[in-house]
Amino acid sequence: MTQAQTATVQPDAIPVAAPASQRWRVADVVALFELPFNDLIFRAQQVHREHFDANAVQLSTLLSIKTGGCEEDCGYCSQSSHHDTGLKAEKLMDVDAVLDAARAAKANGASRFCMGAAWRNPKERHMPALTEMVRGVKELGLETCMTLGMLEDEQAQELANAGLDYYNHNLDTSPEFYGQVISTRTYQDRLDTLDRVRDAGINVCCGGIIGMGESRRERAGLISQLANLNPYPDSVPINNLVAIEGTPLEGTAPLDPFEFVRTIAVARITMPKAVVRLSAGREQLDDGLQAMCFLAGANSMFYGDQLLTTSNPQSQKDRALFERLGIRASDADAMQANA
């Protein structure tokens, strides 16, 4: 009796990575979301390995340099002055305090330091301190990122001249769902700021938040918008909604965690050379789901015990997970995608 052979079954033959010039229609992105889960993850991992070390993850630390009192009415945000969340508005931090936090982040293993301010846009009086923060953090050998709201051309250029590596300005969601979350800033406002950032020579960090009550098609609409930016973002943070008490999205039903993993995979396939970052809401994922996110192509995460005003898994727990998975922390230079 002959020994039975084991057949190896591969997913249907489809291109692993689309040409860089491809326009991602929403229907095309929906089709990715609707692939069988194993096929989607397999394809995303193939794309990931074409461009990155599959076992390297960049650690980023995010510091709120100006908390609360924001003029915008973003429905997910505890820092909006429109919502009663009990968060007290604070002034912009002193430069020395920011640099102390950056030193601590570096000592804890971070290679990227992000500074966030709860503003509609920075005022001119803030720019000297902001540029000093950028220069000081860069002198520590850390990659720098800021998120300060909308920018004017001159402000973007000032930050570029100071050496800012990345500017974060998220699209948040699809154009169709956007009006259900925010009314004080238009979608075009966000796109205009991204243009100013890119024109100033700063790398673009742009992603969104999922789990706000949007449909799968609307999630696909967000990914389509991001992937069709010219060029697509260098860094793509994917946030899982943290439904904060006192915000309009309080009580929103949690997103199926496998849908979050699917979103990571679709982002990797459609933006193959971008750094895909696990951001807010990571504490809602257990170790197994976080491992799936890395398998799906996430290669950066926010690291530390707090993200702006929401909690984040403890640093020691993160290090233990890395050890169990054989993942190593990567510096900024190593996160450049292969051609």
Swiss-Prot record:
It comes from the Bacteria. SMART domains: BATS, Elp3. Residues 55-282 form the Radical SAM core domain. The keyword 4Fe-4S applies. [4Fe-4S] cluster binds at residues 70, 74, 77. Its cofactor is [4Fe-4S] cluster; [2Fe-2S] cluster. The keyword Nucleus does not apply. PROSITE patterns: RADICAL_SAM. [2Fe-2S] cluster binds at residues 114, 145, 205, 277. Pathway: Cofactor biosynthesis; biotin biosynthesis; biotin from 7,8-diaminononanoate: step 2/2. It catalyses: (4R,5S)-dethiobiotin + (sulfur carrier)-SH + 2 reduced [2Fe-2S]-[ferredoxin] + 2 S-adenosyl-L-methionine = (sulfur carrier)-H + biotin + 2 5'-deoxyadenosine + 2 L-methionine + 2 oxidized [2Fe-2S]-[ferredoxin]. Keywords: 2Fe-2S, 4Fe-4S, Biotin biosynthesis, Iron, Iron-sulfur, Metal-binding, S-adenosyl-L-methionine, Transferase. Homodimer. This is Biotin synthase. The gene is bioB.
